[in-house]
From Swiss-Prot:
Coiled coil: none
Co-factor note (free text): Binds 1 zinc ion per subunit.
Protein name per UniProt: Protease HtpX homolog
CDD domains the record matches: M48B_Htpx_like
Keywords: Cell membrane, Hydrolase, Membrane, Metal-binding, Metalloprotease, Protease, Transmembrane, Transmembrane helix, Zinc
DNA-binding recorded as keyword: no
UniProt record, GO biological process: proteolysis
Ranges that cross the membrane: 15-35, 39-59, 158-178, 198-218
Membership in a protein family: Belongs to the peptidase M48B family.
Amino acid sequence: MLFDQIASNKRKTWILLLVFFLLLALVGYAVGYLFIRSGLGGLVIALIIGFIYALSMIFQSTEIVMSMNGAREVDEQTAPDLYHVVEDMALVAQIPMPRIFIIDDPALNAFATGSNPQNAAVAATSGLLAIMNREELEAVMGHEVSHIRNYDIRISTIAVALASAITMLSSMAGRMMWWGGAGRRRSDDDRDGNGLEIIMLVVSLLAIVLAPLAATLVQLAISRQREFLADASSVELTRNPQGMINALDKLDNSKPMSRHVDDASSALYINDPKKGGGFQKLFYTHPPISERIERLKQM
C-alpha cells in the first residue's frame, strides 16, 4: 500500500504541474490581454516565469522555503535532542539524514521540504521543542520524515513554487489596475468594441482575481489526503500510535503562529499555521485534527 502511494505521488507530480501551468497560462493570457494587448505574449511570458520559478524551487527548495519561513539551520551540537530524534526516524525510514532547521516561534508546528529524500530538510518551531515530550517529538518528526519517504515533499515543493508564481502575477496585475495605466487604456479601447471584446475583458479580470484561489484549492486537495498517510506512516515508524495522538492533541490546542506564513507555505506544516475561524475553515490546508485522531484510534 505504501509503495503504491509513493508511485501515486510521483504521478500526481506531473498532474499537479499540468494544472498549475494551465492556471499560469490563464493568468498570463489575462495579464497580456489587459496590459500589453497581446494575450499570447502574456501567456508565453507567464509560462517562462513559472518554469524558471519551479526549477529554482526544485533545485534550491530548501534554502528558499526555509528563508520564506524564517528558519535557521542547526546541528547535533546546537540542537542535540531534535537531531537525535530526526536521526532515529530517518534510520528507521531508511532515508538519508535530512538537514534540520528551527523556527523561533512559540506556536507548535513543523514541516518538511525538498525535491527528494537526498535533498530534504525538516523544520520545527521552538514552541514545539519546548512543549513536546520525547515520544510526541518522535511522532511529529516521524510524520515529517514520512513526507520525505513518501515523496510528498516533491509535490509540496512544486505546489509552493507555482502557487507563489500565480499569486505574484495576479498581485502584479492588481497593482497595475489600481494604478490605472494600461488597464484604463484597454477599457477605453473596448468601450466601443464588440461583445466578444467585452466578454474577454470580463473573463481576463475574473482570471486574475480567481486564479490564486484556484491554486489554493488545488493545494488543499493534495495536502489533506497526504496528511492522513503521513500520520499513519509515523505510527508505522514509531510503533506508538498514542504518541501521535498525544502530539496531535497538543497541536490542536496550539495558538496560530505569531510570524506571518504565506498561503503557499501553509500546506507544508503539520498543523495549519493560521487557524482562522468561520469562513476561513473552508480553506484549511489540513483535515480537522479530531478526524486525524479518530483515524489513528481505528488503526
